[in-house]
Structures are given as C-alpha cells and as structure tokens.
A protein has these predicted regions:
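Short catalytic/metal-binding and nucleic-acid-binding patches
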Residues: 1-153
Length: 153
C-alpha cells in the first residue's frame, strides 16, 4: 500500500471511510455489522476514540479522535515528533490489520476471494470545529436515511 500522505496526530479528529470494491456490498447480513463493530473495538481501542459511525451496505464512515499516548517513563524522553510518528504508524497499522481481518472473515463466510474494499481506507483530517459538527451531523443523517434498508437485512 502506498504511504499515507497525511499523518495521524494525537488529539486530532479524522474521517475514516471506504467502500466496497466495485461498489459491492460489504455487509451482507446483520452479523457482518456486529463483527465489524467488534473489530473496531478489538483493533482500534487505545489508538482512536470513535465519536460517530455509520455502516451502510456498501461502505462505512467513522469519525474518530486519535488518542494521545500516555506519557510513561519509557516514552517521556522522546520528542513530540517521534511520538506523533509512532501514533500515526499505530493507527495506520491497526486499521490495516482490522480491515484485512474483516475481509478474510467475509471471504471465508461467503466463499469468495480477493479484495473486499476499494484500496486503502480513506482518512481526512477534521480541521475546524464547524467541519467536526457538519461531519457528525452528516454521518448520523446517513444512518437515519438508510436505517429501513438495514433493518430488512
């Protein structure tokens, strides 16, 4: 995967999202949604705080805040730049492992092969308070708009 141009900075907000490869469905049944949410908890706990999320049949949106590492004696002497780089790598690696894990589970469950998502997950920094509020409202509005179709699954 190509290197991410924008690093993840502790205490900053980001919009993570991706969609199915060729816009295919990535959540085929209710259990897939549950498995995805459990994966977020398993892989991203301690690295990001999920502020809002929306899982749709063909894609997902996550509004997250990168968690600042607690200062310990081991890392106290490191510069803030080193800590930023470490947080950025940890978040990227955790998301990568999480999405690979989810893809493998779906491929096994539905006897399929290949990529499930359209490339690397997208991550946009949330640079203003206004954008944070707008994004949060957008994510929740998308969920309400698609809730009837999710209940049918």
């Amino acid at each position: 995967m190509p290197r991410r141009e924008i690093p993840f900075v502790p205490d900053q907000y980001y919009h993570f999202y991706n969609r199915g490869n060729n816009r295919q469905v990535v959540f085929m049944e209710r259990e897939n949604y549950v498995y995805f949410l459990k994966g977020i908890k398993r892989y991203l706990r301690g690295r990001v705080e999920v502020i809002a999320y929306c899982l749709m049949p063909t894609h997902y949106h996550l509004l997250v805040k990168v968690v600042a590492k607690h200062q310990t004696s081991e890392v106290a002497n490191q510069t803030s730049e080193v800590l930023r780089q470490d947080a950025s790598k940890q978040v990227s690696l955790a998301m990568q492992k999480f999405l690979i894990s989810y893809t493998k589970a779906i491929n096994k469950r539905f006897e399929r092969t290949g990529a499930l998502f359209q490339g690397q997950f997208q991550a946009k920094p949330v640079t203003t308070y206004k954008y944070l509020l707008t994004l949060c409202a957008y994510i929740h509005a998308k969920y309400r708009r698609y809730t009837p179709s999710l209940r049918a699954r």
